[in-house]
């Protein structure tokens, strides 16, 4: 069988062949450029696809260039495959925990890892037509498959063809970064770009990094049957989230069988027998090594900025990616950037709305600002962790500016009934008002619940108003309304309470 051209396409079964035919067709013929483009998009991930489709839908002449697979990380090696595998792991955990609900399951729960991964590949392929080369061609877009390079301030070369543009968008995304660990270059390791090509469950897997990807995959592999060791930094689990959120997730990882070690940058790696990898903490060289069969490195992302001739176009860039202003313009005002290549908000939904900002600003002389976007995010562990607004560290450094209201999920009836009481809803408001500035949620469906808060922030709806919003009973959404009740109680000052008492005495 023909070898896959890109790692995410392994194994090259019927599902990945379908995926390839949609997002990286082998015999694609690039069009001939005809005149100047309103917009040339480099990168066919979320930001690039949204910008291309949206611009073409408004009548713009658009070119879309992708050097690997349309759909980018989200479809091929990120959101889509990870959530499919997480769903399988969640199902396995649900069966194991069935006894808590009075449901007896005879015998040991058996997981067919190969079948779970095939399910993922099938679902990914089923979703892929939405991001296909043919779909975007049918939208009137010139789709070029190949490597793009700027040759001047308003020209790009791809496949030996020169494209001239009025505006361009750099949406090349980011890739997995390699941390400076001793021995890492000498061992074979997985990243998010390769882990979903596994067909057999690793008996023992080590995961470096306790951010969202590391935590999601640690819990997933443990629930599917691997012996998992999670190597964290001294900052612990989910270090960018609230400390108590990280504590809750850490406890759940341990409950699922994950061993957590704070080796961090002190980790030293060495190839062992039979393809295994020996992991040691340099601080304790005499201690026995942790031996794993596979190693997943999930520490940070590096923007894709090299090899595009950015210097020729006058586009400044650095380790953090392409430099942009609040309107997402680069140092060449004809050229914009969106998505992971230029933003600290490395999420699919953030890339989507950054692309919409670019459409308004690049094609219609708009003045939409990146800083005006309300961008939530979520980590899909069990329970989930979601946040919107300034980070936990930023909030802590400005705590005098906010009032916070916390509702424990143990006080929410639906969470009690379903056994999901570990977690909380915490909402921050501007001191002296009910204007919502940020929120952290740890709950079964925190990724869904946070949308209520981000919608309120976008629409300018205050926490006091949310208190008057009726939720069906019993739902976990009541937790947000309860936070509103806490806010309203602060308005019952001793003076107001005294007036109420006097009134009630008088009207008795």
Question: In which residue ranges do the predicted regions lie?
Answer:
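Flexible, glycine-rich terminal cap/loop adjacent to redox cofactors
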Residues: 7-12, 42-44, 56-68, 73, ...
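N-terminal Rossmann-like FAD-binding beta1-loop-alpha1 element of flavoenzymes
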Residues: 37-64, 214-223
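A Rossmann-like FAD-binding core segment of flavoenzymes
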Residues: 105-106, 142-145, 149-157, 163, ...
């Amino acid at each position: 069988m023909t070898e896959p051209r890109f790692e995410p396409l392994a194994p090259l079964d019927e599902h990945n062949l379908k995926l390839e035919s949609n997002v990286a067709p082998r015999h694609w013929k690039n069009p001939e450029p005809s005149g100047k483009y309103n917009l040339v998009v480099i990168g066919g991930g979320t930001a690039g696809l949204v910008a291309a489709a949206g611009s073409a839908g408004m009548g713009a002449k658009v070119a879309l260039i992708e050097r690997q697979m349309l759909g980018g990380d989200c479809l091929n090696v990120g959101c889509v495959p990870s959530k499919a595998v997480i769903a399988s792991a969640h199902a396995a955990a649900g069966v194991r925990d069935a006894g808590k609900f009075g449901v007896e399951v005879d015998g040991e729960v058996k997981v067919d890892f190969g079948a779970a991964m095939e399910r993922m590949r099938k679902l990914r392929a089923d979703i892929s037509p939405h991001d296909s080369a043919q779909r975007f061609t049918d939208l009137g877009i010139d789709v070029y498959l190949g490597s793009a390079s700027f040759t001047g301030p308003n020209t790009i070369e791809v496949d030996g063809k020169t494209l001239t543009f009025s505006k361009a968008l750099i949406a090349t995304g980011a890739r997995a970064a390699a941390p400076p660990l001793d021995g890492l270059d000498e061992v074979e390791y997985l990243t998010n770009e390769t882990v979903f090509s596994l067909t057999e469950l690793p008996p023992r897997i080590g995961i470096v990094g306790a951010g969202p990807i590391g935590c999601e995959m640690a819990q997933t592999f443990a629930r599917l049957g691997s012996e998992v060791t999670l190597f964290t930094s001294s900052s612990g689990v989910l270090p960018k989230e609230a400390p108590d959120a990280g504590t809750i997730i850490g406890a759940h990882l341990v409950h699922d069988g994950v061993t957590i070690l704070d080796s961090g940058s002190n980790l030293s790696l060495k190839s062992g027998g039979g393809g295994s990898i020996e992991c040691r903490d340099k601080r304790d060289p005499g201690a026995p090594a942790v031996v794993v069969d596979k190693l997943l490195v999930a520490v940070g992302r590096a923007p894709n900025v090299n090899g595009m001739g950015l210097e020729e176009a006058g586009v400044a860039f650095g380790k953090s990616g392409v430099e942009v202003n609040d309107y997402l313009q680069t140092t060449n005002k004809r050229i914009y950037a969106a998505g992971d290549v230029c933003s600290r908000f490395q999420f699919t939904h953030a890339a989507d709305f950054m692309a919409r900002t670019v459409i308004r600003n690049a094609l219609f002389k708009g003045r939409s600002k990146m800083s005006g976007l309300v961008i939530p995010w979520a980590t899909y562990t069990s329970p989930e962790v979601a946040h919107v607004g300034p980070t936990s560290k930023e909030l802590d450094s400005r705590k005098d500016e906010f009032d916070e209201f916390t509702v424990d999920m143990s006080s929410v009836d639906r969470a009690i009934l379903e056994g999901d009481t570990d977690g909380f809803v915490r909402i921050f408001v501007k001191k002296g008002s009910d204007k919502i500035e940020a929120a952290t949620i740890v709950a079964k469906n925190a990724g869904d619940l946070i949308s209520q808060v981000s919608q309120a922030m976008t629409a300018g709806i205050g926490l006091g108003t949310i208190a008057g919003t009726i939720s069906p009973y019993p739902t976990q959404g009541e937790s947000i309304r309860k936070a509103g009740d806490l806010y309203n109680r602060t308005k019952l000052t001793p003076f107001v309470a005294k007036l109420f008492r006097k009134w009630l005495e008088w009207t008795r």
